[in-house]
Amino acid sequence: MSPAATETERWCVVTGGRGFAARHLVEMLVRYEMFCVRIADLAPAIMLDPQEGNGVLDEGLRSGRVQYISADLRDKSQVVKAFQGAEVVFHMAAPDSSINNHQLQYSVNVQGTQNVIDACVDVGVKRLIYTSSPSVVFDGVHGILNGTESMAYPIKHNDSYSATKAEGEELIMKANGRNGLLTCCIRPSSIFGPGDRLLVPSLVAAARAGKSKFIIGDGNNLYDFTYVENVAHAHVCAERALASGGDVSTKAAGQAYFITNMEPIKFWEFMSQLLDGLGYERPSIKIPAFIMMPIAHLVELTYKVLGPYGMTVPQLTPSRVRLLSCSRTFDSTKAKDRLGYAPVVPLQEGIRRTIDSFSHLTAGSQSKREGPSKASRILGGGKVADTLLWKDLKQTLIAIFILISIYYNFVATGSTVVTALSKALLVASVFLFLHGILPEKIFGYTVEKIPASQFHLSKDSSHDLSLSVISSWNTTVKALRSLCQGNDWSFFFKVVFVLLALSLAGAISLHSIFVIGLPIAFLAFLVYEKKEQEIDSIVVSFKSFACKHKSDVYEKLFGSKKHD
């Protein structure tokens, strides 16, 4: 139960107060003693992070100047209870923007926002500041350069988050003036800074997985990134403007405002500075967005299927690809003129502070894998593993070039297997002959000759090959004997499954193997190596599910026979 506010205390409420930007706002409000702060969030109790111990928030909680109340915005009675005695509400709560679940986003961003408005009116809150997003004017297709608040909402938004934030924003602006309530909307662009749990951690995870070397798009798209302390400052400016009275509050109320650092920068240059500062490789390889989009759709579809079995929310989604390849810059002149907003931390200083705050994620701090990965062990750990896992980039690119050459010269022409093989042997013979007649030096460069020993099969290799053939023959004979006895149903089904798989594989053309199989081989093992834990957990869940039903099926099929 929240203690009642005394006459001398001025209380404000921050919904979603344990979120990234909200934490910085709470700390600013408490540090400068602007308000007593009531944090409203979903968790049943507040749990301070280690770095918050003995800090401003910890001291505020102990002194009573900061309160925590558990509240679900979808329950109006809980919202009303949280707002009792408050003069100002900073409505910052929202689901993760990467979760493209319309029902969840709508229930919080629209229905929850309506509950916030109604509760403010019911308990007499004077000012309501809503944290919106620049994505409310983004259609996911067309870039935005120096966008202003005069831009209309698009017919179709990039995702459910953007669409529902736009609906919530409309509700907030229409509520201005109800029972004396003054409202406005803040649209902070691409927030970054200490305490971020999405941008920098995702960037570092990509770097450690070897994916940060890629640039999606042409790399020239501009962005407005906003340091988190400037976002908190913008909320304070909005509250002060609404509280000023007269023309200032009249002009400020019922409006939306873009908030930026007022220093546009190329998106990939910003990412490069963060990566470079943390000791990782800068992105340099450009991949067109139209190539990444089908992959992103496939990842999103996979998540819809495997999400219930523990798959984490993917960062590569169609909406993210659009965001990474488009320009998005905004004009903050209106916020400057009507709210008195100006950034208090410059962009480069914000980047420096952010890098310093994530020192535990630097390249030298990551734990090393002991021994080869499971994917490498599956592939034998030799040259094949190094090639398919891109360990030796030169070797991998040479292998890809050779396979592409084989495809276009022998497979794509529609040749039969015998014709393709004869052509390949012809090319090999011509190459070896010409290579043999070349002089040892050409224009001062030494020509490395292929020694005859390369084509010689040693006695040990011959012995090993013979043992492999004999072992395979004995294994086959043993399997046939087991089948002849007719007792092992499990083994019978395994044999049937393998033979059916081979028959299906035999129906696949050489063309399909090259076009579909080889690209998958060069990607599947690499993906498995990078996401080994996640994939293994999904496999374990599937096996557990299969085992639960295996005994029932077996009993139904063969139980009656045993009873007979």
From Swiss-Prot:
Disruption phenotype: No noticeable phenotype.
Biochemical pathway: Steroid biosynthesis; zymosterol biosynthesis; zymosterol from lanosterol: step 4/6
Reticulon domain residues: 384-564
EC number: 1.1.1.418
Domain of life the protein comes from: Eukaryota
Keywords: Endoplasmic reticulum, Glycoprotein, Lipid biosynthesis, Lipid metabolism, Membrane, NAD, Oxidoreductase, Steroid biosynthesis, Steroid metabolism, Sterol biosynthesis, Sterol metabolism, Transmembrane, Transmembrane helix
GO molecular function: 3-beta-hydroxysteroid dehydrogenase (NAD+)/C4-decarboxylase activity
UniProt GO BP: auxin transport; plant organ development; regulation of transporter activity; sterol biosynthetic process
Principal place of residence: endoplasmic reticulum
Membrane-traversing stretches: 398-418, 424-444, 486-506, 507-527
Keyword Transmembrane helix applies: yes
Membrane topology category: Multi-pass membrane protein
Catalytic activity: a 3beta-hydroxysteroid-4alpha-carboxylate + NAD(+) = a 3-oxosteroid + CO2 + NADH; 4alpha-carboxy-4beta,14alpha-dimethyl-9beta,19-cyclo-5alpha-ergost-24(24(1))-en-3beta-ol + NAD(+) = cycloeucalenone + CO2 + NADH
Cellular component per GO, a single term: membrane
CDD domains named among the record's database cross-references: 3b-HSD-NSDHL-like_SDR_e
Positions with a binding annotation for NAD(+): G16, G17, R18, G19, F20, A21, Y161, K165
PANTHER family from the UniProt entry: BIFUNCTIONAL POLYMYXIN RESISTANCE PROTEIN ARNA, SHORT CHAIN DEHYDROGENASE_REDUCTASE FAMILY 42E, MEMBER 2
Record function comment: 3beta-hydroxysteroid-dehydrogenase/decarboxylase involved in sterol synthesis. Catalyzes the formation of 3-oxosteroids from 3beta-hydroxysteroids-4alpha-carboxylate. Involved in the regulation of inflorescence internodes and leaves growth, probably by affecting auxin transporter activity possibly by altering sterol composition in the membranes.
Family statement drawn from the similarity comment of this UniProt entry: Belongs to the 3-beta-HSD family.
Name of the protein in question: 3beta-hydroxysteroid-dehydrogenase/decarboxylase isoform 2
Species per Swiss-Prot/TrEMBL record: Arabidopsis thaliana (Mouse-ear cress)
